[in-house]
């Protein structure tokens, strides 16, 4: 079977001149007059041979060559007369839907079905707002997803990326244009990805946003890009379509950015230069985190700090809020507690207060939950910018001391270096749970030893509950 290369696809990404200096990488490369990037829809298909030459697996090459065939636990029912229509009564929303359908056609992501009498599985196309104020077309595949075979997989996380970045390193970032749409859909699977608008029927020819297997598929295919890179010169972190490159030298970082751009071009990947940052940096935002590699610190981004302050102020002005808003509050604060010193510790009273008044298993999202003065006191800490911006270390601390502690139902003891301290429990204390006694032993040991403030101390105890409690604040 021969594949026809869409016109212009070979110019999907144009690169800076060969002699481009890393220090000059400040603006997107100029396009050659008369040439334009080809449609992004299924744009990797004509480049399957280049992926094969790169060393990608036979499975990856097969998907790129013939398209991704949906894998089902159970074949979904097909219909000839679709009842689901994406046309809207609201003229403003309907205009947006029509524009997005045309945009998807222009991108080569969907095609019009000429034989409307052929059976297919139909879903609804709707719009969700993007960060830049535009709209993202999303096909509601929630019903179709129930028929798909589950694909568990591992992808980069905030924790895994932070664990591998280095203090003093330099980075650049690359963002792909309409990332999922790069991947073609197999001819026989397109009938399951149909949508109707009025009298017209369309089906996706490229991987749509909203398919439950899309993150797995995209991550598995794009991981092959690393085969064309030297891991000794560049560490590449791929968080779906957001990529971060790390080098230990600024000059090498600029050169490796160019190397990766050339590799993307050769593989048919379309880079979004407006969202990419090719200038080597040590202070940057990535996946919702502000990194300062010069000092080796992590911070909440400015946008996330404003989001925290906004919702906290709303709660401080209120006597009660619906459970839905409480969940939003805890979710927003919880998303930042990793980057705020003692953030988890400061969030605990708010979580406990909410769960004492409302239970997910029995309560409704609309239930009004009172805001106590104790909760407001805890929230007041979160509204202080100085508490949110000291930063947390990127790397694990270097411990100056190691403290060994132990406790029983009669007393406690600890030693650090050549110093030893111990004590007996009072009549009231012996009634406490052993986990509380083990934790209290650590506190008493630190007070008795009177260590200088600002030190990092490694505490060794045989109580795993206490270890977890301290590490998780």
Task: Name what the model sees in each region.
Residues 145-151, 182-184, 231-267, 289-300, ...:
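Catalytic palm subdomain of template-directed nucleic-acid polymerases
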Residues 149, 278-394:
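C-terminal reverse transcriptase regions that engage the nucleic-acid substrate
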Residues 104, 169, 180, 200-234, ...:
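Conserved pre-motif C helix in the palm subdomain of viral-like polymerases
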Residues 132-145, 161-185, 325-328, 403-405:
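Conserved catalytic palm subdomain of right-hand nucleotidyl-transferase polymerases, strongest
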Residues 199-217, 221-223, 314, 417-440, ...:
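A short, polar/acidic, helix/strand-boundary loop motif
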Residues 60, 215-264, 445-461:
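Active-site palm subdomain of RNA-directed nucleic acid polymerases
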Residues 3-153, 200, 237-242, 340-375:
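Reverse-transcribing Pol proteins
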Residues 80-87, 136-145, 195-219, 318, ...:
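Short, conserved non-catalytic motifs in the polymerase core
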């Amino acid at each position: 079977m021969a594949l026809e290369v869409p016109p212009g696809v070979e110019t999907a990404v144009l690169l800076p001149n060969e002699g481009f200096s890393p220090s000059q990488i400040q603006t997107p490369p100029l396009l050659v007059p008369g040439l334009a990037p080809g449609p992004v829809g299924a744009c990797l298909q004509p480049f399957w041979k280049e992926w094969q030459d790169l060393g990608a697996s036979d499975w990856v090459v097969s998907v790129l060559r013939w398209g991704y065939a949906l894998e089902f636990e159970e074949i979904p029912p097909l219909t000839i007369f679709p009842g689901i229509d994406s046309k809207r009564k609201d003229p403003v929303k309907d205009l947006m839907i029509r524009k997005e359908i045309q945009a998807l056609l222009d991108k080569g992501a969907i095609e019009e079905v000429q034989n409307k009498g052929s059976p297919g599985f139909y879903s609804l196309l709707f719009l969700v707002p993007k960060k830049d104020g535009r709209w993202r077309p999303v096909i509601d595949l929630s019903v179709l997803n129930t028929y798909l075979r589950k694909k568990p997989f591992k992808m980069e996380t905030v924790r895994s990326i932070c664990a591998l970045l280095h203090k003093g390193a330099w980075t650049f970032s690359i963002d792909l244009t309409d990332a999922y749409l790069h991947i073609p859909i197999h001819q026989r699977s397109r009938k399951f990805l149909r949508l109707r608008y009025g009298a017209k029927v369309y089906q996706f020819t490229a991987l749509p946003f909203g398919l439950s297997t899309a993150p797995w598929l995209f991550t598995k295919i794009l991981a092959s890009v690393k085969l064309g890179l030297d891991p000794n010169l560049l560490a590449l972190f791929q968080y779906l379509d957001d990529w971060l490159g790390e080098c230990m030298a600024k000059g090498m970082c600029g050169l490796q950015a160019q190397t990766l751009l050339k590799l993307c071009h050769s593989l048919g990947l379309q880079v979004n230069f407006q969202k990419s940052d090719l200038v080597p940096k040590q202070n940057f935002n990535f996946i919702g985190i502000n990194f300062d590699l010069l000092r080796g610190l992590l911070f909440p981004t400015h946008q996330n700090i404003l989001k925290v302050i906004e919702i906290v102020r709303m709660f401080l002005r209120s006597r009660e809020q619906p459970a839905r808003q409480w969940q939003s509050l805890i979710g927003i604060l919880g998303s930042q507690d990793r980057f705020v010193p003692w953030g988890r510790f400061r969030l605990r009273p708010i979580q406990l207060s909410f769960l004492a008044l409302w239970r997910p298993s029995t309560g409704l999202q609309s239930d009004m939950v009172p805001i106590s003065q104790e909760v407001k006191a805890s929230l007041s800490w979160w509204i202080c910018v100085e508490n949110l911006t000291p930063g947390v270390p990127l790397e694990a601390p270097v411990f100056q001391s190691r403290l060994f502690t132990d406790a029983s139902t009669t007393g406690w003891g600890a030693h650090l270096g050549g110093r030893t301290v111990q004590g007996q429990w009072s009549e009231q204390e012996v009634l406490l749970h052993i986990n509380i006694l083990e934790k209290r032993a650590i506190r008493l040991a630190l007070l008795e030893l009177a260590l200088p403030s600002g030190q990092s101390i490694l505490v060794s105890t045989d109580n795993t509950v206490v270890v977890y409690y301290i590490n998780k604040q």
